[in-house]
Amino acid sequence: MKGQETRGFQSEVKQLLHLMIHSLYSNKEIFLRELISNASDAADKLRFRALSNPDLYEGDGELRVRVSFDKDKRTLTISDNGVGMTRDEVIDHLGTIAKSGTKSFLESLGSDQAKDSQLIGQFGVGFYSAFIVADKVTVRTRAAGEKPENGVFWESAGEGEYTVADITKEDRGTEITLHLREGEDEFLDDWRVRSIISKYSDHIALPVEIEKREEKDGETVISWEKINKAQALWTRNKSEITDEEYKEFYKHIAHDFNDPLTWSHNRVEGKQEYTSLLYIPSQAPWDMWNRDHKHGLKLYVQRVFIMDDAEQFMPNYLRFVRGLIDSSDLPLNVSREILQDSTVTRNLRNALTKRVLQMLEKLAKDDAEKYQTFWQQFGLVLKEGPAEDFANQEAIAKLLRFASTHTDSSAQTVSLEDYVSRMKEGQEKIYYITADSYAAAKSSPHLELLRKKGIEVLLLSDRIDEWMMNYLTEFDGKPFQSVSKVDESLEKLADEVDESAKEAEKALTPFIDRVKALLGERVKDVRLTHRLTDTPAIVSTDADEMSTQMAKLFAAAGQKVPEVKYIFELNPDHVLVKRAADTEDEAKFSEWVELLLDQALLAERGTLEDPNLFIRRMNQLLVS
């Protein structure tokens, strides 16, 4: 063969092959689904390119995939007459994994076989799945529009290297031959192969044909029998499609091994005509937070495949949605640039967004357990919604889930509708607190009075929460209120104090003046508070000041953080505050006040500028 060379696999390929063969063996038949799915993609790509260059069909426009086997040679062959590959494409697609973050993904895999198989399934193994059942794979291919002598040969045993060479191939497309491992004879059985193809390929539009050999007049006559329906699933009537078919189609388009949580199939006629089939996965893709992660729907125009990952039809906070849209209103020569500025696209995006939010609302209402699975996988992404989509903010807010003081659990199961239904008589606001962790939120001294009054507080501990709450200002006409900020409604709760207590407070006015004089500009104000029951002091921020959590977000992003000026609030009923107020020695008084302030800052921020000084002060006061 001309131009023959032997190349080494990209190191990640070797590791993936090893893990895949061991992790996916229990579900080994999926290799056929993956290879037929790739053939379907190759046909879609040829149809799309042929829109502008019909000569690419080379007089053969009847696209199909064929499956045949040779029992004597123990080979199984999957061939298509799709777009084919050039030599460079063969090296690029079959010798490397062109995905960012592959190395870190592989490092995340461990020895848990069930978990590994799920992760590898999410990764989309495609062509490499052939090595689950084959100890050698041979590929012969020629790209559409290339001369026969520009065919390409590729072969590998999946060990560490592969051979590539130039060949002559008369027909366009790709032929993959699997040299089956010992013990894999089931894939040489006609009935077994037929059943696998029927299971995985009934929903794709490409005809899948299996070879039939018959003896006639002493000669072997070869014919091809179509064994799938070869009708695009989304074009069929919903009443004719089984749940199993919907699930298999999801696995086909998403390259996911897991069943979806739910789906929505709709045909819309009228001003705009389109069909959509949208799925909510049951597990987040491993690279969902990678900036290079592609997302979006498959786009078809009048049943002709146009592109993968058309992100223009779904907002970023719904990037986990998989599926397709088939539009009758877009031109066949549509490009990503045209989609960006198209009124049709904007209208479709708005309609599909509402469809997904309704689908999630229905899931939450009908199956709380499944919705909790969704929330655990995609809740953080959905929390981007209130800032990105003001038009649907109320609908998104209904889907949010939180931990709260109502449940003694860090699980985020409380909806805003749940919270509102439990609000106390006369309560006008929805109270919440943001913190670095659930434990920090739950034990915050800011909650003491609210707990005493039996008022529920939402406990927010995801990094995105503070940012989200800047945009989510109310729900069901009720404003949100952070309990770590000074607020009139909180003051009202705290001011329910008897007259004798108020008289006692007046006596502490000189003490407050001494504290103000000592701390000066380091705090915004010093005041007494009745918001505390067990804690001597807290710090809080004014309504118009940057919160502690927002300051942390700025710092983590490397941005300049404006100084946060706290209001220092002291509990007049606490023994430590009384002791400080009774201390006449100025040095000792200073130690007490600084210690109380440090305690309050530590509870609020989780850190101190000088923890050693704090420890020294505490030790001195303990021994004095």
From Swiss-Prot:
Entry keywords, A to Z: ATP-binding, Cell inner membrane, Cell membrane, Chaperone, Cytoplasm, Membrane, Nucleotide-binding, Phosphoprotein, Stress response
Record carries keyword Membrane: yes
Positions of region (B): 337-552
Stretches for region A: 1-336
Membrane topology label: Peripheral membrane protein
Binding site for ATP: 38, 80, 127, 174, 255
Cellular component aspect of the GO annotation: cytosol; plasma membrane
The keyword Cell division belongs to this UniProt entry's keyword annotation: no
Gene Ontology biological-process entries: DNA damage response; FtsZ-dependent cytokinesis; protein folding; response to heat
Pfam families: HATPase_c_3, HSP90
Annotated transmembrane regions: none
Protein name: Chaperone protein HtpG
Protein role: Molecular chaperone. Has ATPase activity.
